[in-house]
Structures are given as structure tokens and as C-alpha cells.
């Protein structure tokens, strides 16, 4: 999620995904998403399988995908973030090639909340980090 305006990283990713979807080049779309979302270590292990994945992965509704992707570029929640009063944990990744680590830092600073950055992971840290679910669970059950 980008809070205020958009940086070049998110604009390039979204523009590319919309363009590939409009062309119905789902193989390139899946490959580009994987390259931007996963760490180099993950890609090294799974890149050979991407062609297989592209045979079964594509947006179920092309127009909906495009609309949702474009909406990411116009969403501006920055001025509302300080209204969040409940305990909040923002998790980001240093190697995020979709929105960049700056988005996570900006969110946490504006909310005034806890921030955790995975150092060697990308946007899909939620899939790659072995401790991701435990980290979220521990945060949610803290103080109970």
C-alpha cells in the first residue's frame, strides 16, 4: 500500500502489470510479478518452475484485475493514518520491488506503531519468511 502519492517503484510495477494484462500476456505477467515479489534466493530455487505456473495462472477477470491494479495508484490514505489508534504492526521487506521498503517505514511513522523489516526478502515476505505467521500471532496475542 502506498500512502502518499506514488513512488517510481510502484508506478512501474503497476503500469507493467496493467499493460501485460491488457495484452493478455499472462506468462510475462506471472514472471514479472514473481521477479518483483520474491527474493533472489527464492527465485533461484523456483524460477525453473515459472513456465509451468504461467500455464495455470491468470487473472480470473481481466477488467477487474486492471481496475484494482490502477486503483492502487490513486489510493491516498496518508492523512487518515493518524486516526488508527489500536496497536498496529507494519511488516515490510528491505528488497521489496513492488512498493519499496519506504512505504512500510512511512506507514509505521505516520501511525506511530511497531515496525518490522525483513532484511533479505521482498514483497512476498509473508510467503517466504518462516516466522511470519508466528510474528503476527505473537503481536496479536501480546498482553492477553
Task: Annotate each predicted stretch with a short phrase.
Residues 121-134:
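Catalytic histidine-centered segment of alpha/beta-hydrolase-like enzymes
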Residues 84, 110-111:
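Short, structured coil segments at secondary-structure junctions
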Residues 7-11, 27-80:
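Conserved alpha/beta-hydrolase catalytic His-Asp/Glu region
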Amino acid at each position: 500500500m502506498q500512502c502518499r502519492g506514488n513512488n517510481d517503484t510502484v508506478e512501474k510495477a503497476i503500469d507493467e502489470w496493467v499493460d501485460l494484462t491488457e495484452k493478455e500476456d499472462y506468462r510475462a505477467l506471472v514472471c514479472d510479478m514473481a521477479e518483483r515479489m520474491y527474493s533472489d534466493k527464492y527465485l533461484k530455487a523456483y524460477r525453473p518452475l515459472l513456465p509451468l505456473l504461467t500455464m495455470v495462472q491468470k487473472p480470473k477477470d481481466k477488467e477487474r484485475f486492471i481496475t484494482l491494479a490502477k486503483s492502487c495508484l490513486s489510493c491516498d490514505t496518508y492523512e487518515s493514518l493518524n486516526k488508527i489508534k489500536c496497536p498496529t504492526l507494519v511488516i515490510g521487506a528491505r528488497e521489496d520491488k513492488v512498493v519499496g521498503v519506504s512505504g512500510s517505514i512511512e506507514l509505521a511513522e505516520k501511525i506511530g506503531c511497531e515496525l518490522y523489516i525483513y532484511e533479505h526478502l521482498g514483497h512476498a515476505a509473508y510467503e517466504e519468511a518462516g516466522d511470519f505467521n508466528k510474528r503476527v500471532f505473537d503481536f496479536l496475542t501480546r498482553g492477553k
